[in-house]
Amino acid sequence: MGNLLNSIHSPADIKHFSVPQLEALAQEIRDRLIQSVARTGGHIGPNLGVVELTIAMHYVFDTPQDRFVFDVSHQAYVHKLLTGRANRFDTLRQPGGLNGFMLRSESQHDSYGAGHAGTALSAALGMAVARDIAGGHEHVVALAGDAAFTNGISFEALNNIADQTRRLIVVLNDNEWSIDRNVGAIARYLHKIVTNEHVSQFHDSAARLLKRIGGPAAANMVRRAEEAAKGMLWPSVLFEEFGLTYYGPIDGHNLSLLIDTFKFLKQQDRPVLLHAITQKGRGFEPALAGQKKFHGLGPFDPETGETSSSGQPTYSEVFARSLVKLADQNDKVVAITAAMPNGTGLDHFRPHHPARYFDVGIAEEHAVIFAAGMATRGFKPYCAIYSTFLQRAFDPIVHDVCLQNLPVVFCMDRGGLSGDDGPTHHGLFDISYLRGIPNIVHMVPADEDELADMMYTAMLHDGPSAIRYPRGTGPGHAVKQQPEALPIGKAKVLHEGEDIAILGLGALLPMAEQIREELARQGYRAAVINPRFVKPVDTELLAHYADRVTAFLTLEDHVLMGGFGSAVMEELNALGKSTPVVRIGWPDRFIEHGKVDQLRARYGISVEAAMEKLAPYLTRSAPLSVR
């Protein structure tokens, strides 16, 4: 049949394809996904699982007039290939290339941007209601994985759909996985439906009947039979109780069946939910064998699936090993994750202390309140959540943890720039959104050993704590056998100096050392300080240097607005000191995806940029101001 994928410039190009051609296209897409993502890295497993589903959606519906909303949208690679971006697909997640998620500014076919779970149903309902008010006729289709239904936002939307619109299609992509295996009652409920042999036999028969008869008569007959069967096979279908007519489960890899089903659903004048069973990693044996690993990963060998490793432990691994040691010593230590045991490292904790390990699903708000409840009973919860995902639980952090001064520890992985995953996954706001909350202590380690010390310090602290640490590996410092408790709010002076005081926060402490060396070459002596604490800031240290240096330089892997540099300025102002503060950090904008080093250079987070900003202060007679 030739190279079908290269002939597709818009979804309209597949509408004349036969089913055998579409099946051949599906194989081409899988081959392209494997070969391309092997070079760029990305979410290979989820996308291999939705190839037929996405092809069928584009075959039946007409984007951009019809609207597709992908929950999380990490599974939108096939959609990108079918909507005119195949010739740029090799740039996926690369600097200046395609984003790894849906992005409204990237294509008119991307109706809604995403990167976090649970948003698709609410957004799709908003589009459907807007269409109804405007008198439009376009279709709105929300594609959400079964993991998204462990998120409370999805149920808030379900609670409103039937009351607010008559036409909305929800596609439940059920592969039984988020990143790890799905957990909780919803996962068990869906599994029960899928494994009900009588239900499966009924739907196979219904599909054959629909295909054989066709037309409205068949649709009505099948619907009446389904309703009768549902009453016999299970007394109360969850989605029907929310007012959505349920269809399924059906084979999410059967193109002919999917196309017929979508054509049928397209004619319905009521909210419907299609339950499609898919296989994560389908068509690539390494991804099938390692579904957790191949959810999302860096470059890999397209033949074997093998990935390279530096051998040096990541911050996530150091965190997990340290937590195991703390739990060995203290039977009140518990670990909580929101569907991220692999990403946070807690899959290492689980076998050591299974009774004190809790995966609550994609439910960050619940995770925080659950932790608060445990803390009231004398336990020490370590709540491991990516920085970007913890912002979803801001109110529980304030209302349930900090207001009650409960000893919950927030372990914020991916604090700082995350790189290839882009703005939905950068952890650039946590200092701003946490440091204004009373009672919380906020720590930032500069190396692996300091992370272990901070986790120990948090265990001893009788109040809320937060620890932010970056993605990937650190400088390679060995972790002590027994961690040390750090004095709360005290920085560590690494080098004394009387010209400039450099405060290098966390991962940017090595840059502080480089700036010190450059200043020394120019004849200036700079103090280098490891702040360690964002809150409380070491006021005594600031007062000491404010009377000695011509300027402070703060370095942070965080937005400048409300960040660590702002905290330093506020403390100096409270002390009545007018010493200038030069701040290096991220600007007031959403930072695109790309390589961390390249993005830092582009946005002036570099030795060169710091030296340029410091130039006016490299003399004792420089005017006092804040830059």
UniProtKB/Swiss-Prot annotation:
InterPro entries, per the entry: Dxylulose-5-P_synthase, THDP-binding, Transketo_C/PFOR_II, Transketolase-like_Pyr-bd, Transketolase_BS, Transketolase_C, Transketolase_CS
Keyword vocabulary terms for this entry: Isoprene biosynthesis, Magnesium, Metal-binding, Thiamine biosynthesis, Thiamine pyrophosphate, Transferase
EC number(s) per entry: 2.2.1.7
GO cellular component, one term: cytosol
KW Nucleotidyltransferase (keyword) present: no
Tagged with keyword Magnesium: yes
Cofactor(s) needed for function: Mg(2+); thiamine diphosphate
Transmembrane segments: none
A GO biological-process term: thiamine biosynthetic process
Broad class of enzyme this protein falls into: transferase
Gene3D superfamilies per the UniProt record, alphabetical: 3.40.50.920, 3.40.50.970
Cofactor binding notes: Binds 1 Mg(2+) ion per subunit. Binds 1 thiamine pyrophosphate per subunit.
Record's catalysed reaction(s): D-glyceraldehyde 3-phosphate + pyruvate + H(+) = 1-deoxy-D-xylulose 5-phosphate + CO2
Sequence positions that bind Mg(2+): D146, N175
HAMAP family assigned to the protein according to its UniProt record, in alphabetical order: DXP_synth
Its job: Catalyzes the acyloin condensation reaction between C atoms 2 and 3 of pyruvate and glyceraldehyde 3-phosphate to yield 1-deoxy-D-xylulose-5-phosphate (DXP).
Similarity field: Belongs to the transketolase family. DXPS subfamily.
Record protein name field: 1-deoxy-D-xylulose-5-phosphate synthase
Record organism: Acidobacterium capsulatum (strain ATCC 51196 / DSM 11244 / BCRC 80197 / JCM 7670 / NBRC 15755 / NCIMB 13165 / 161)
Source organism phylogeny: Bacteria, Pseudomonadati, Acidobacteriota, Terriglobia, Terriglobales
